[in-house]
Amino acid sequence: MATNLRGVMAALLTPFDQQQALDKASLRRLVQFNIQQGIDGLYVGGSTGEAFVQSLSEREQVLEIVAEEAKGKIKLIAHVGCVSTAESQQLAASAKRYGFDAVSAVTPFYYPFSFEEHCDHYRAIIDSADGLPMVVYNIPALSGVKLSLDQINTLVTLPGVGALKQTSGDLYQMEQIRREHPDLVLYNGYDEIFASGLLAGADGGIGSTYNIMGWRYQGIVKALKEGDIQTAQKLQTECNKVIDLLIKTGVFRGLKTVLHYMDVVSVPLCRKPFGPVDEKYLPELKALAQQLMQERG
């Protein structure tokens, strides 16, 4: 059901203007930039997209704009997860209406929900998605929900689930999931271990830094398919040098600043309470943007 979802999917950023409103023109440019750099698909409205500091209406607007720009060109996954099941269902129905290829949802967080409540949450979203496959989103470091291997196995075998986004550094668990579910579409979620995640069994990845250097991650996939571990490791090292800088600057605001210097995003701001990039990092980010533009050609 979800085998066509394998690949390298950029976790799409959401541009805002100086007044903190959605910057629709920059969003359209960013979608086109990702298409042009050879990405396989977009994961829209997730952590990187600052979904949880947006209203439901804004999240729907983002889904609609992305679909207008990219439907039929690349694969589209709508992250519809909210703490509220009803709001998640509303977004899932919108994703279906706009023509997305799949929906995704993080485990409901903040309140200590039981595991059966988590399962019921996913079942309800799957029902509202009306046939779109579900990508379960496991990100314990941010959600605070630490699923056991048995619980993951239960979630990914719910009717309608076709994939798992595994944002965890536990590569042993990644391999265990692959061993248990050979046909499951499995995404690596941490960009800094992309090559290792593929070797542990992932089919591809969903990541924030793909927005600025997606071709490098495609290069890792190609190298590993050809058995060229040395090239894959070299590319991963180059990606990780970028990630080192972004961790210092703040990942989302750092990415937006690089894209600003690339003339893709007009205003390099995240939505409050996120603050701007410290000015001392601007020269490094500008140099990075120039390096990546030259590398991309």
UniProtKB/Swiss-Prot annotation:
Keywords noted in UniProt: Carbohydrate metabolism, Cytoplasm, Lyase, Schiff base
UniProt-recorded Gene Ontology molecular function terms: N-acetylneuraminate lyase activity
Keyword Lyase in annotation: yes
Primary subcellular site in the record, as a coarse category: cytoplasm
Localization per record: Cytoplasm
Annotated catalytic residues: 137 (proton donor), 165 (schiff-base intermediate with substrate)
GO CC list: cytosol
Catalytic activity: aceneuramate = aldehydo-N-acetyl-D-mannosamine + pyruvate
Biological process per Gene Ontology, one example term: N-acetylneuraminate catabolic process
Binding residues for aceneuramate: 47-48, 167, 189, 191-192, 208
Name of the top EC class for this enzyme: lyase
Recorded superkingdom: Bacteria
Pfam family name, one: DHDPS
Function: Catalyzes the reversible aldol cleavage of N-acetylneuraminic acid (sialic acid; Neu5Ac) to form pyruvate and N-acetylmannosamine (ManNAc) via a Schiff base intermediate.
Protein family per UniProt: Belongs to the DapA family. NanA subfamily.
Complex and partners: Homotetramer.
Protein name: N-acetylneuraminate lyase
Organism lineage: Bacteria, Pseudomonadati, Pseudomonadota, Gammaproteobacteria, Enterobacterales
